[in-house]
Amino acid sequence: FLLNRSSDLLCGFNVSNLNIPNFIQSWEENISVSYPDRIASSLDIMIDGPLGASSYNNEFGRPCLSGYFRTFEKKIADNSYFGYHKPVMIAGGLGAIDNTNYKKNEIKDNDLIIVLGGPSMLVGLGGGAASSKQSSKENEELDFASVQRENAEMQRRCQEVIDKCSNSLKNIIISIHDVGAGGLSNAIPEIVNDCQMGAIIDIDKIPCADKTLSPLEIWCNESQERYVLAIKPKHLDIFEKICLSENCPFSVIGYATDDKLLVLKDDSESYIELPMDLLFGEKGKQQIKVNSSAIRETSADYSGFNFHDCLIKVLSLPAVASKQFLITIGDRSVGGLTVQDQFIGPWQVPIADCAITANDFSFKDGEVMSMGEKASIAIINPIASGEMAVCEAILNLCSSPVGNIAKIALSANWMSSFDNDFDKYNLFKTAESVTSNICNKLGVTIPVGKDSLSMKMSWAEGNKEINVKSPNTLIVSAFASVHNLKNIIKPMFVNEKDSSIIFVDLADGKKRTGGSALSQVLQIDDLECPKVENILKFKSFFEETQNLINSKKILSYHDKSDGGLITTLIESAFAGHVGIDIYYNQDIFGLRKNFDSERDQYIKFFFNEELGVVMQISNKFLTEVQKLYSEIGIKTYVIAKLNSEYEVTIYDSRDKPFYNTSLEALHKIWHRTSYEIQKIRDNSKTSESE
């Protein structure tokens, strides 16, 4: 079996409100931000964007098994909004690499520089660079020029060449670099600078699909499915044979030199002749002086809202609702190594916390990946948003037998408008806190990441200028190896009567609802948002949970996230197709013994999005499990039991039901948003029958 291979993929979306025709939600009606003619609407993006991702996955032959989808829009002031008119569309994946190949080797004098893959085209010119420019009417032409084109077939050919080289007894590739932002103008200098070398490049040797391209366009375009790599001259014949066997284009475009000079030339003239130090020399740190102030934290009053109305709205919010329309368009089993995709249980409910694949066809060990993001919190407290995103990603994969938390590796993608000193300050402090306060204390690493610091769009509308910028957004992807795939726990209640459902509180009893799905759908300015209360206690929880997984004492596991505790419980009931009785004990949650005021607390308790987990435990292990968590300072509460009807009932502290409804009815509401998009995108009759 291949030692070096790509495995599975992930895909995520942040967009502004969808405003689906004939299905416009109450929280969308009062925020009506238009779009300039040059950009697609959020609904158009969510109809066409996922099709692009899934078709590429299908053509390339890798399953997309994980992701997220968030819509967000909020008015800041007149003509100024938070939102994702400049959307976040994140794609990534997981792979395995043998320990003989993970380090790049030293490029030496006269080693060949090769471009592998497709030709240069006048597409994506300034693409990655343009993503770091604020969008406005003045650069509308660049907006269109920045659009890149995909070619999954070419990518697969490149992958086969790389696989053959990396899985041979001796890898003839010395060093390799994918061509991304900046095109060859970035990839070539970087690959030689890593080895303190220079390079002489013949621009005429760079493959071009369009012979009219200028030297600048050849050098800077960001045509996809290309790699820059270095090999020894003596290995050129072998490399050529591999490329011919895979029908993959390549060209020797130059060679490395000792003189640390970058030269781009043709037979008649030199276009670039620069010392490498000029490109990569140390720059002084930018100093920004900001008069910061303490974040004003004031909670909102939810006592006047009806519980059922809140639940209906929250279940309809895209961040909470079913993501089925994003999933069924892709092949999730290609390659034959998928262990867990987005769908859970025999009823195939899309609520998976993580994606899991096997290493090989023995299906003994494998890999897990998950995602975490809390962008809606960032408009209140960017630092808390970053910390919560990391912890959410880790909680999402905690249901897999990972073992030591230090085995988890994170990827961080940072998005910000970065257009004022406060945004810069908040981004800096968030990055500082995520690394020093969270990752260092957990013992996990963030070896990779990306950023886009231009998440703002402005345009003229009549005599007004409209501005839409994104919150400071951190998207965290978590990856780890899994040992013993038979021990993975699913977010699905098992129909075992002699069991209890416990809530594991990782927020020390806090019930802050700022930045929650609830505050978004009710359009409430709630300035008290969730935070990571005790990161060392969080680490202890992870370690203890891993022990319980290995000893097979957990029946189901689902972390509390968008929508809060109530949606966590309901989703697990959907997947298991079982009913649940939920118990609200006044003493446990430290409320006043006043039955009239008790119901005012229900909404905050059930809809807050503090860190927490719901587990189903067999009653024979219940006391032991609660004791183990108690010993590390974590409180757990028996929150629910299974019932014989497919319905949810919530009991107050007097054991009187105050809420009861059919889970089938809630499931239809939860699925409605996905259905409405499918109805527009796909055959409407097929969507209706489904």
Placement of each model-derived feature along the sequence:
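Glycine/proline-enriched, intrinsically flexible loops and inter-domain linkers
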Residues: F1, R5-E690
